[in-house]
Amino acid sequence: MSPTRREFLGTLGGLAAGYALAPALRAAESSGKPLGLALCGLGNYSNGELSPALLETKNVKLVAVITGTREKGVKLAKLHGFDEANIYSYEEWDKVAANKAIDIVYVVTPPGIHAQNVLAAFGAGKHVICEKPMAISAAECDTMIAAGKKAGKRLAIGYRLHFDPYHQELVRLAKTQEFGPFMKIKSANGYTLRRKSWRIEKKLAGGGALTDMGIYSIQGVCMAADANPISVTAKELPKTQPELFVEVEQALEFRLEFANGAVADVWSGYDANRAEIFAEAAKGWFKGERPVFSYRGLNISTSAKGKLDFGIFRQQQRHMDGVAQAFRNGTEVTCTGEVGRRDMVIIDGIYESIRTGKRVELKYS
């Protein structure tokens, strides 16, 4: 079982003091060798996407796992060739700290326990990659960012699409304004969820479709606008399965407004299979259709180039290699903890708008 948040907060200071400045770790980072990574949480994403990608990465390799199910760790140890002694429980952060082969901990647990896992990893003197959403509130994000700074370690979020060439084309178009600024943006992302899972438990998921699927649209919209929204107006949609979605929303709609007058209308839900984004400017457009936010086979086109084709690759490999290289070289990445926090400010604002029925101004400081 995972330790409680109170237990982690109580021990963070001592762990950070003991391990944040380990000389051997600094030497490993500067050597040019692949950094060692430990997966924290061995669910479907770790086993189905991250593990295969780590067989292809050049800048980082899997050297350990942190899991509540040792059998899962044994399988990955055999596949990736690391010692079974490097399979740790969630209570063995002292051993993680002592393992000099581990440079990065990739937190892939449910969002409700991201903060406690990230705090523990920083306390163990490791860099951190944290899956999305970064946390279940902007306040938790602040705690995580502060812990990383105290430990002198880097934090990145698992925003794989920052390293995806299709979405990088959207970023390029927005920054160069080749078509002019994108003033009208629409996006939708969701799927049909019919059975119970941790994703509909508020304590673990933080929210419903918004924190799981809507966050992709938030990312895409901010890429297209090349800015952070200044306000949001949102409403929850009627539930078609109220007996299932007791604690969280099933579907919602929201509008984001930007300082230059651009607007983005977004839908997110667990009651339909949708994935799309459309950004329109005076001289052209960018369009992504299902699957636009998926792991592979993206269907994206622009008014200038038609359908884009960047070949076959693993997004997760590009993401982890890119982040590891930045950690090793001391260079910047776009998927920072601050960006993860920005998205949680927006999500907090969406839920506030639903509660109050009012337009909410978004404040990032």
Which residues fall in each region the model found?
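N-terminal secretory signal peptides and thylakoid transit peptides that target proteins
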Residues: M1-A16
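Rossmann-fold dehydrogenase core element
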Residues: T143-R160, M183
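C-terminal capping/lid region of NAD(P)-dependent oxidoreductase domains
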Residues: K153-R154, G180-K184, E352-S365
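C-terminal glycine/acidic-rich active-site capping loop/insertion
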Residues: R160, A275-V345, I354, K358-S365
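Contiguous beta-strand/loop segments that form the cofactor/metal-binding neighborhood of enzyme cores
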Residues: D212, I218-S294, R318-T331
